[in-house]
Structure formats: C-alpha cells, structure tokens
C-alpha cells in the first residue's frame, strides 16, 4: 500500500513539487501562499536534494529568479498571492514569449471571498493574456498530481505554467 499523508493544499503542492524534482523555489511572503515555501524549506527532502529556497524582495524579482533557474534547465517554482501577480505581471507576461527550458510553475494563490487577504482577484486572466496555460486543482490530491504534471508539461512545451490555487490552502 502506498504511503498516504493528510495535507493542506499548499503542503500537497509543495510535496508534489519536491517529488517532481524541484531545484529551486522563489517567493514573496503573503498569505495564502507563504505555506508552500515554508513547507519546502522545512522538508528533509529539500535539504537532501539541495533545493534552493529564497524569499525574494518582491514578486517580480521572484519570477525573474525562477526564470533564470529555468533558463539553466532546472525545475523552478515561484509562489505568490493573487495581488502579487500584479507586481510580477511584466516578467510573467514576457515569460510567455521568452519561454522556459527547465519546468517552470508559477503559483498564484487566489483568495475568493477575501478569506485571508484584502481583496479578490482572478489570476486566470493573466494566463489568458500571456498565452500561458492555467491549471486549477480542486482537491489536495489533484494539487499533488497536477503540479507534477505541470512541470512535465512546461518542459515539453517550453513555456511556464500558471497554477491557480483558490482556498485549497485551508
């Protein structure tokens, strides 16, 4: 029987990224996305595999650092809350044109009904605008499976993938 764990959505995404061969995670702290990077930082697999974990100065910087890692052929994850997509918009939209070498997954933790933030925003429109595919899991298991698929898809298509999380962190 397979090992089973009870995880929040953010934790499922972090564990799926680690199991997908993550090389680095870049983020700007902000609920509801902070827990993803914290989980990776504290997981023994990240230390064992020397996964680079960095809190960036802002979301645009995090996006650019993750792009740099991807350009080098490594799998990178960038995490931000929904309003962080506004800050990272320039780098995110242009990444649809510059592409990615290693898998690049951009996580936007949207917050419908303002459960843990100051406003509502639907980040799917950024994906549509930038011609970047958007994956939106609805359960923790889907989140774990989908992030692994997202890295593979990004590498095969040579473009980033946007994963929209909406209240899956609860």
Protein language model annotation of sequence segments:
Residues 1-148:
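Thiamine diphosphate
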Residues 168-170:
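Conserved small/polar residues in nucleotide/adenosyl-binding loops
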Residues 27, 163-165:
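Conserved beta-strand positions
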Residues 144, 151-163:
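Conserved anion/nucleotide-ligand pocket segment
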């Amino acid at each position: 029987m397979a090992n089973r764990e009870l995880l929040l959505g953010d934790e499922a995404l972090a564990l799926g990224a680690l199991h997908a061969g993550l090389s680095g995670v870049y983020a700007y702290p902000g609920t509801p996305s902070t827990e993803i990077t914290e989980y990776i930082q504290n997981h023994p697999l990240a230390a064992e595999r020397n996964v680079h974990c960095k809190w960036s100065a802002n979301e645009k910087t995090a996006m650019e650092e993750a792009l740099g890692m991807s350009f080098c052929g490594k799998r990178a994850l960038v995490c931000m809350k929904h309003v962080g997509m506004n800050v990272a918009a320039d780098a995110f939209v242009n990444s649809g044109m510059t592409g990615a070498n290693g898998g690049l997954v951009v996580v936007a933790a949207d917050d419908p009904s303002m459960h843990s933030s100051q406003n509502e925003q639907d980040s799917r429109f950024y994906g549509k605008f930038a011609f970047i595919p958007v994956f939106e899991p609805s359960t923790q298991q889907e989140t774990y499976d989908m992030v692994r698929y997202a890295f593979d898809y990004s590498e095969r298509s040579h473009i980033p993938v946007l994963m929209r999380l909406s209240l899956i962190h609860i």
